[in-house]
From Swiss-Prot:
The gene is truA. Formation of pseudouridine at positions 38, 39 and 40 in the anticodon stem and loop of transfer RNAs. It comes from the Bacteria. Homodimer. SUPFAM superfamilies: Pseudouridine synthase. Substrate binds at Y114. This is tRNA pseudouridine synthase A. Keywords: Isomerase, tRNA processing. HAMAP family: TruA. Its EC number is 5.4.99.12.
Length: 275
């Protein structure tokens, strides 16, 4: 049978989602917990998880979805309670659900939402250390939010996002579709919410880096379109820090009845998380 899980995690202690040699990863922690909960049966049927989004080092998740195959039957909440018993405090399973064999956490997803939380001001906040990005600004200055919003317009739709693509990206194509970008200002915070069908490696962080160049007045709002058209990573801004990036939501066809993520326990404002 195939089981889907909904996860939340603090990505700061980990070298990303995917298993890596001699590095702590979320996939390893989850598979160890699943193996411990399943018990002896896991020896004959090892656990291997497939995820909707392979988050990078330091990136967090509010609504990650994974699936795995098993020959062990459990009630849905038994998976939640049992697996959480073996997980570190930085990772939690919010829900579990048996799904049909044709469901894939990765390939069945048709929309993903990321949120980037940025604190901008003269002093960083130790309270949200590793939970938010930080940009040092003088006390009497703030980002030009309207200029950033204007620059975002050119990114909506289907485009070749090569200028925002990491050299390590394994995607077969740089062409992706962005459905919406919302920039929400609540000084000293700015939140970037981006919805799309899929994203390239470092794509969100590279876009945020460009937004901040424009928000600080170092580039005009029209510069974003120039970067997009160039299809050249060297033209864009440096990759911004991972700390403030959250995989917030993933959407699937209604036929799979995948639960919505539990966002009420996230520290982000309600108007940022959205519906």
């Amino acid at each position: 049978m195939r089981i889907a899980l909904g996860l939340q995690y603090d990505g700061s202690p980990y070298a990303g989602w995917q298993t890596q040699l001699h590095q702590p990863t979320i996939q390893d922690e989850l598979e160890k917990a699943l193996t411990a909960f399943i018990g002896e049966e896991a020896k004959a049927f090892p656990v291997h998880t497939i995820t909707a989004g392979r988050t990078d080092t330091g990136v967090h998740a509010l609504g990650q979805v994974v699936h795995f195959d098993t020959n062990v039957g459990r009630e849905d909440f038994s998976w939640v309670r049992g697996v959480n018993t073996f997980l570190p405090k930085s990772i939690v399973v919010n829900w579990a659900k048996e799904v049909p064999e044709e469901f894939s956490a990765r390939f069945s997803a048709y929309e993903r939402t990321y949120i980037y939380a940025l604190h901008a001001g003269p002093c960083r906040s130790p309270i949200v250390n590793a939970r938010a990005g930080y940009l040092m600004l003088p006390p009497d200055q703030f980002l030009d939010v309207e200029a950033m919003k204007k620059s975002a317009e050119c990114l909506i739709g289907e485009h070749d996002f090569s200028s925002f693509r990491s050299s390590e990206c394994q995607s077969k194509t740089p062409v992706k579709t962005i459905y919406a970008i919302d920039i929400i200002s609540q000084e000293p915070w700015v939140y970037f919410r981006i919805r799309g069908n899929a994203f390239l490696h470092h794509m969100i962080r590279n876009i945020v880096g460009c937004f901040l160049q424009i928000g600080q007045g170092r580039q005009q709002s029209g510069w974003m379109a120039e970067v997009l058209t160039a299809k050249n990573r060297q033209i864009a801004a440096p990759t911004f820090m991972a700390d403030g990036l959250y995989l917030a939501k993933i959407k699937y066809p209604e036929e799979f009845a995948i639960p919505q993520p539990w966002l009420e326990n996230a520290w982000l404002p309600t108007n940022v998380i959205g519906k």
